[in-house]
């Protein structure tokens, strides 16, 4: 059968939810449900069909938004969030190759291309040297002779800020959430323009700053 590359983002472990412990707990629960599904530790409502799909996942790509550690966050909260992520990535990397991209809220440089997160954040997970990779944003890789190129979304968000692209421009074949239509429309335009970040460096920080 076919293989799947699983794309996921927005774990935002460490997010305080403006002091809302329930929101923080919900974020952790969602992340753990995802890990359990990918590693086969839990089943979904659809039963065998979903389990079969999970078994076909050959790589997980975490497209940014892994952490949301505020500058004014206390040490205990930050340390706890990093430990949670380390455990989560250890579970994933023990079952399937994982690429962790940097993103907008992650502790790395903000200009594109963003450098990989430092291995010191994930001492246990990075022991899986063959399956746990901390990678740049944008990130390109190949699976079974199929090439992938992706970002953590800053380029798409910036295009939407400074263009008239909106949900009505999305393809009629798009069957996803209506809230994602404008982003999908902007993403498809970057393919037509053959430019990953057309608004850089004017409104999206990048390096080098000029040709």
Regions found by a protein language model. Name each.
Residues 1-211:
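Extended recognition/assembly regions associated with phosphoester-bond processing machinery
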